[in-house]
Every structure is written in C-alpha cells, then in structure tokens.
Amino acid sequence: MENKLKLEVITPYGEVINEEVDEVYTTGAEGDFGVFPGHCAFMTAIRIGSLSYKKDGQMHYLFVNRGYCEVLNDRVLVLVGSAERVEEIDVERAKAALARAEERLRKAQAGETDIDLARAQAALERATIRIQLATKLIPR
C-alpha cells in the first residue's frame, strides 16, 4: 500500500467504507484536519460534519455523525454513530427531519415538553449539515 491510506468508516450498522485512498479530511474535536500517507499516529473525537477522501484523483464525500478517528500506520479508522455517502442523502427526508428538530427545539426552549434540549440541538445540527452537504456537493 505504498503512498496509500487504508480508510475504514464503521457505524453500529456496519462498514460504510473500506478502501485504499490517497488522503482523508474530516472535522475533529479541535477543528478540521487532513491525513496523508506517513502521517503521525493520533486519535481524536469526530464532530458532526463531513468526511472527504481522495481516491484515484477524485474526491468523495460522506456525512458523518459523532465518533472517533484513529490514525496509525497508514490506516485511518473512523468509528461513528452513522455515516452516509452524500449522493445517497434524501434531501426531502432531511428537510422533514429539520422541521421536526426545529419544532422540538422550540418546545424544549419554551419548557412545553420534557424533550432533552441537547438532543434537540444535535438533531437540528445533523439535519442542517446533511442538507448543506447534499445541496452543495451534489447537483440535483
């Protein structure tokens, strides 16, 4: 695997990516970072956002939920709650999720419900980022 990285993206539902790639980019707890072959070993938390990778000169994009990333010996292991290829995001479903999240957040802030405010904010963030990624990166 000379000058390549082994990228594995795994969720509780199974493996999403298992490929040899040229480079990987995502958003960690301390900000965005990139990984290239020969990168030093490290581990970080992953924030809700995008994960992109270059393979054979072409960029590929995923939505990723919170999780962890380990870089070790030219291997990038990403363990996240969920991951979805951007081209597979159902924008209408994401918009419906956004509307539900906004309503739950409104009710939680007004004290009208027992909904956990942090969960409502996380749902809003997930829906917003999914829509942004799908509409900006994939022509519809």
UniProtKB/Swiss-Prot annotation:
InterPro entries, per this entry? ATP_F1_dsu/esu_C_sf, ATP_synth_F1_dsu/esu, ATP_synth_F1_dsu/esu_N, ATP_synth_F1_esu_C, ATPsynth_dsu/esu_N
Q: How does it sit in the membrane?
A: Peripheral membrane protein
- Major location, coarse class? membrane
The alphabetical list of record keywords is: ATP synthesis, Cell inner membrane, Cell membrane, CF(1), Hydrogen ion transport, Ion transport, Membrane, Transport
Pfam families with a match to the protein in the record = ATP-synt_DE (PF00401), ATP-synt_DE_N (PF02823)
Establish whether keyword Cell inner membrane is in the entry: yes
Gene Ontology terms describing biological process: proton motive force-driven ATP synthesis
One GO MF term attached to the UniProt entry: proton-transporting ATP synthase activity, rotational mechanism
Q: What CDD domains does UniProt report for this protein, alphabetically?
A: F1-ATPase_delta (cd12152)
Q: Which domain of life is it from?
A: Bacteria
Which Gene3D superfamilies has this protein been placed in?
Answer: ATP synthase delta/epsilon subunit, C-terminal domain, F0F1 ATP synthase delta/epsilon subunit, N-terminal
Question: What are the GO cellular component annotations?
Answer: plasma membrane; proton-transporting ATP synthase complex
TM region(s), chain numbering = none
Q: What is this protein called?
A: ATP synthase epsilon chain
Please name the source species.
Thermodesulfovibrio yellowstonii (strain ATCC 51303 / DSM 11347 / YP87)
Recall the taxonomic lineage recorded for the source organism: Bacteria, Pseudomonadati, Nitrospirota, Thermodesulfovibrionia, Thermodesulfovibrionales
Q: Which gene encodes it?
A: atpC
